[in-house]
Amino acid sequence: MNILRLDASMRKTGSYSRILTDKLIEQLTSGKNNEVTIRDLADGIPLIDENWIKANFTDVDERTCEQKVCLVASDILVDELYKAEHIVIGLPIYNFGVPAAFKAWIDQVVRSKLTFRYGDNGPVGLVENKKAYIIIASGGTKLGTEIDFISDYLRHILGFIGITDVTFIDSSGLGRDESQTLAHAHKAIERV
């Protein structure tokens, strides 16, 4: 099984999303022959800019060498996504949203004619037959509440590119009851 692991926490140590992602990866790979690609978003993801936009919307056969170079990082990230059967995302909530590095990753992989296309009835996701696990960690923002702006966004953007089998592992609200929240998350991981 090929697994793509995305770590979105900017904290390299002491991060609950990273700790729980370690546990989930261990659960998924136990006793199996697996390849895990680790993409640590804290190491940096290029932001898209005007040159990237121009290159992306230029037909592949018409791209200049500079435009091809501009898209190299994006092409690598898209390739990692396509190779994976499972995508495991460790995601903290920062200021009621996803970390900037995760949004940068989304911008790099959501590409017309590559990960989605427009059909007669609207957009069609091209990244099919994938399973996504998303570990959400937060101090106070609880999933499923009126201030949860993340879960619907993630379901939508992943579904937009074709990833519709999404499981959330909830470790939100750690600031309220850390031990109970972590126990819940560990049980959810064991059920995977």
Swiss-Prot record:
Cofactor entry: FMN
Residues that coordinate or bind FMN: 9, 15-17
Keywords: Flavoprotein, FMN, NAD, Oxidoreductase
Pfam family, one: Flavodoxin_2
Cofactor binding description: Binds 1 FMN per subunit.
Catalytic reaction equation(s): 2 a quinone + NADH + H(+) = 2 a 1,4-benzosemiquinone + NAD(+); N,N-dimethyl-1,4-phenylenediamine + anthranilate + 2 NAD(+) = 2-(4-dimethylaminophenyl)diazenylbenzoate + 2 NADH + 2 H(+)
Keyword Isomerase in annotation: no
Top-level lineage group: Bacteria
Subunit structure: Homodimer.
Protein task: Quinone reductase that provides resistance to thiol-specific stress caused by electrophilic quinones.
Family: Belongs to the azoreductase type 1 family.
Name of the featured protein: FMN-dependent NADH:quinone oxidoreductase 1
Gene that encodes the chain: azoR1
